[in-house]
């Protein structure tokens, strides 16, 4: 930097400062990536994937050996501008990426996702900038309704230079929330605003055709969001159908309860009659519906978002996880694990503080149904005990933070972090 400051030509000085900034940014990114290199975890993943049909262990074992060698050699030289150390660090990260992305579970080589263009704010924003509500006690109605640059995309060539194809983009600046792939894998359900800025459930084919609302309703003040497909063609969605609001904010945040809707005959029936919010209905492997419900009255409501399950018609509604406990405060984005009758993954978060993102936990209610008793594993912290922590802002200062996990099986997940 001192040498640059002594440059007499201003244009040369500016160019060299820009080059220095790029170099510092490269080293910062390398340092951040190396913190999560975790060679021991890569070894365990390799040993597990070797057992899967289709994994080319002979191809990737030399990469694993090279990764081990490079880690043993060390990367401290990157801070002195040692070009060999920088090259070694990049090589180690490339080996890790290749080994893990060779997982046969990714052989389909396509992912459908929501993409948000956020420019230079990408390293600073949290989930409200990605279309979620700005707190942990409200539904989608409290989320931003315009000013987004969002689209549904299909990602492919996952193991190489990733390709991206636009499936759909709103024309009104709406966010895109609550993506649910149809059972047939040819179309996707999602939430966006209508022209009058009310939320509704929509569907589009993955080839970009067939865009349409899934819920058609003439009521001028009803909204629908956070939907899920039922196997029989009907859908469950969250709606402001109860016309009530959250008490502690004087009703300013609308409460959403679940409705059952049939697109064929446009019939609708309310399923839940809760004082406060429901979130994230999803079909379990046994055909029941799992969701999160916020209990409020006569208890410490900072700590009472409970995972529930019910039949698709709303009967036999029961607590599944968290009733009677103060940890965790919230469990969002629950998804059943493939091949399991009881286990699921979810994101635990707080009440105030960081909204909707948090720690990623695998639960199994057959092992316990409250607090840490049924928490099988926190990802990515292998061998770290999960400790009960009764705290309002539960995940403030926690890193990494996750949202929207999608299990590929009971060991591997796609998740936004």
Which residue ranges define each predicted feature?
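Long amphipathic alpha-helical scaffold segments
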Residues: 5-33, 47-166
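Residue-level detector of Asp-centered blade-edge/turn motifs that repeat once per structural unit
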Residues: 106-107, 183-184, 230-232, 284-286, ...
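Hydrophobic beta-strand positions that form the internal "hydrophobic ladder"
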Residues: 111, 188, 235-236, 289, ...
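Multi-bladed beta-propeller domains
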Residues: 160-174, 205-223, 261-276, 311-330, ...
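Signature of short aromatic-glycine-proline-rich micro-motifs recurring in repeat-based ectodomains
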Residues: 176-180, 224-227, 325, 330-351, ...
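Asp-box/WD-like beta-propeller blade repeats and closely related beta-sheet repeat scaffolds
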Residues: 197-279
């Amino acid at each position: 930097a001192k040498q640059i400051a002594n440059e007499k030509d201003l244009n040369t000085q500016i160019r060299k400062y820009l080059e220095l900034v790029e170099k510092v940014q490269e080293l910062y990114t390398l340092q951040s990536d190396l913190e999560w290199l975790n060679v021991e975890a890569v070894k365990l993943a390799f040993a597990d994937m070797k057992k899967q049909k289709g994994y080319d262990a002979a191809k990737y074992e030399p990469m694993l050996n090279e990764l081990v060698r490079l880690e043993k050699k060390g990367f401290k030289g990157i801070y002195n501008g040692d070009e060999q150390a920088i090259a070694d660090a990049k090589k180690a990260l490339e080996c890790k990426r290749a080994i893990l992305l060779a997982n046969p579970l990714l052989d389909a080589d396509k992912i459908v996702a929501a993409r948000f263009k956020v420019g230079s704010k990408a390293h600073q924003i949290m989930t409200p900038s990605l279309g979620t509500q700005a707190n942990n006690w409200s539904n989608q109605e409290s989320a931003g309704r315009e000013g987004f640059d969002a689209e549904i995309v299909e990602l492919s060539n996952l193991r190489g230079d990733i390709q991206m194809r636009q499936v759909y983009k709103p024309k009104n600046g709406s966010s895109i929330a609550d993506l649910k792939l149809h059972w047939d894998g040819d179309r996707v359900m999602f939430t966006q605003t209508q022209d009058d800025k009310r939320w509704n459930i929509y569907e589009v084919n993955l080839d970009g055709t067939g865009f349409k609302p899934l819920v058609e309703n003439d009521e001028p003040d009803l909204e629908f969001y956070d939907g899920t497909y039922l196997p029989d063609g009907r859908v469950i969605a969250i709606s402001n159908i109860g016309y009530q609001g959250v008490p502690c904010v004087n009703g300013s945040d609308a409460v959403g309860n679940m409705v059952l809707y049939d697109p064929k005959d446009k019939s609708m029936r309310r399923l839940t009659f809760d004082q406060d919010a429901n979130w994230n209905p999803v079909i379990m492997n046994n055909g029941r519906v799992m969701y999160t419900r916020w209990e409020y009255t006569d208890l410490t409501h900072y700590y009472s978002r409970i995972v529930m399950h019910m039949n698709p018609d709303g009967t036999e509604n029961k607590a599944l996880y968290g009733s009677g406990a103060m940890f965790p405060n919230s469990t969002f984005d629950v998804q059943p694990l493939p091949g399991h009758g009881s286990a699921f993954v979810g994101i635990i978060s707080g009440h105030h503080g960081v909204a909707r993102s948090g720690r990623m936990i695998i639960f199994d209610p057959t092992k316990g149904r409250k607090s840490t008793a049924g928490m099988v594993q926190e990802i990515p912290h292998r061998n770290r005990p999960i400790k009960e922590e009764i705290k309002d802002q539960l995940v403030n200062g926690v890193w990494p933070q996750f949202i929207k996990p999608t299990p590929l099986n009971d060991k591997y997940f796609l998740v936004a972090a």
